[in-house]
């Protein structure tokens, strides 16, 4: 099954409770606007739990918010879970556990059994042309209500480009890097 990361966006109502809510809403999509703890809990339940099913959130693009119980992991049916998302290799999220420690030549800490070991068996980073992605976002985001095309362009540069650079910095943490073809290369 595919476990989409978008369901772990912090709901808009919770973002509006942040101390600087206008900034949090504007930067939605940045690492701190996702619920990494909920993702970690669900990965723990899937990987190390014994529940026959685990309900997982999705993202309702029509509402612009996560939707609880949108996906179901069934232990009896799903032998492979592909977890996809932007910040899964983000070092502050601690989702790679021993995988990254082994890659970096570090030894497991003796007696530390709570280090998220085993969330991912293998990680793949799909690298895309940054400029092409930024331009696609500018076009896609023009449907966001309340923003002019110029405001969308500014937001993409200030928010989405920064987020993309954050993602790119985690590329070396993956076991495999695959280069995505641009439109001109795939024709």
Predicted regions span which residues?
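ATP-dependent NMP and nucleoside kinases share a basic, alpha-helical "lid"
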Residues: 66-140
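Receiver (REC) domain switch/active-site residues of two-component response regulators
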Residues: 6, 121, 175
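Short gly/ser/thr-rich secondary-structure transition/capping motifs
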Residues: 58-68, 83-86, 156-161
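Alpha-helical scaffold elements adjacent to nucleotide-binding pockets in ATP/GTP-utilizing enzyme cores
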Residues: 38, 42, 133-140, 155
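Conserved catalytic segments around the Walker B and adjacent sensor/switch elements
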Residues: 1-4
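Small-molecule kinase domains that catalyze NTP-dependent phosphoryl transfer to phosphate-bearing small molecules
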Residues: 110-115, 139, 143-187
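Conserved RecA-like P-loop NTPase ATPase core
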Residues: 6, 39, 82, 124, ...
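Conserved nucleotide-sensing/catalytic segment adjacent to the nucleotide-binding pocket
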Residues: 9-63
